[in-house]
């Protein structure tokens, strides 16, 4: 098969990063940015389809500032063929981002559109579904396996403690769960090759965000834990009293 696979990726904060606020906004200075881990799974899935002879070309597309170029380069180093950066204000909401991505996708006419089912930073799980709706394509969410044959995708998804198998005609939007695969680490050869792979830039399609973020706030700090240092019997008594009087646990 000679299918074109397009993967939507996003640049997000490192999941281990400590988030700080300044004037009601996220202070991103000095915070490490990475490719969204869920999108990384989608990239790996695309590469595996190419290794199986299903896909001929893998295109990655990201919407955002120039910083999103790092996410694209990571995908290229993993094995994608070329990239597209849709230049867009990072404050754009999921609707505006989906419009921008969908417009870029239209120009590529891919057979399969992959994405992580959620972004690690906002957790909205909206963009793949919105892209599918805008393009008028079928969408299968949180897949853990996919087989391509006869112009159709047979997808396995998690569902209520079991699995669900869905068959859709291509082209289609398919969003992945992290359990689909284990993304590979880019090799040094891949990293060097990624620098020479083409990345086109495009202006985002005009779309006004439907959601406006007024400010961010951090959750209240957790109270310090209780530490009891004494003989075991005394510790047990003190702990029982604390549970009874503080958290209102019935102690018998």
From Swiss-Prot:
GO terms for cellular component: cytoplasm. Gene3D superfamilies: HUPs. SMART domains: ETF (SM00893). Pfam families: ETF (PF01012). GO terms for molecular function: electron transfer activity; nucleotide binding. The keyword RNA-binding does not apply. It is found in: Cytoplasm. InterPro entries: ETF_a/b_N, ETF_b, ETF_beta_N, Rossmann-like_a/b/a_fold. Part of an electron transfer flavoprotein involved in syntrophic growth of S.wolfei with butyrate. Probably receives electrons from butyryl-CoA dehydrogenases, and transfers them to the membrane-bound quinone oxidoreductase Swol_0698. Belongs to the ETF beta-subunit/FixA family. This is Electron transfer flavoprotein subunit beta. It comes from Syntrophomonas wolfei subsp. wolfei (strain DSM 2245B / Goettingen).
């Amino acid at each position: 098969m000679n299918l074109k696979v397009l993967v939507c990726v996003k640049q997000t904060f490192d999941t281990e990063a400590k988030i700080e606020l300044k004037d009601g906004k996220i202070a991103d200075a000095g915070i490490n940015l990475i490719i969204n881990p869920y999108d990384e799974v989608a990239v790996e899935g695309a590469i595996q389809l190419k290794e199986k002879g299903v896909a001929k070309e893998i295109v990655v597309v990201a919407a955002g500032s120039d910083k999103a170029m790092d996410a694209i380069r990571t995908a290229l180093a993993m094995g994608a063929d070329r990239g597209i950066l849709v230049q867009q204000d990072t404050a754009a909401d999921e609707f505006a981002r989906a419009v921008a991505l969908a417009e870029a996708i239209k120009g590529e006419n891919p057979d399969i559109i992959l994405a992580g089912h959620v972004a690690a930073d906002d957790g909205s799980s909206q963009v793949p579904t919105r892209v599918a709706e805008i393009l008028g394509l079928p969408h299968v969410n949180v897949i853990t396996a996919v087989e391509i044959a006869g112009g159709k995708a047979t997808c396995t998804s998690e569902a209520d403690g079991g699995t669900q198998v869905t068959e859709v005609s291509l082209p289609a939007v398919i969003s992945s769960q992290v359990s689909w695969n284990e993304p590979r680490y880019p090799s040094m050869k891949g990293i060097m090759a990624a620098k020479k792979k083409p990345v086109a830039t495009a202006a985002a399609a005009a779309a006004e965000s439907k959601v406006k973020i007024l400010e961010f706030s951090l959750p209240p700090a957790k109270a310090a834990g209780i530490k009891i240092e004494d003989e075991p019997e005394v510790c047990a008594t003190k702990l029982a009293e604390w549970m009874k009087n503080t958290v209102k646990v019935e102690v018998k």
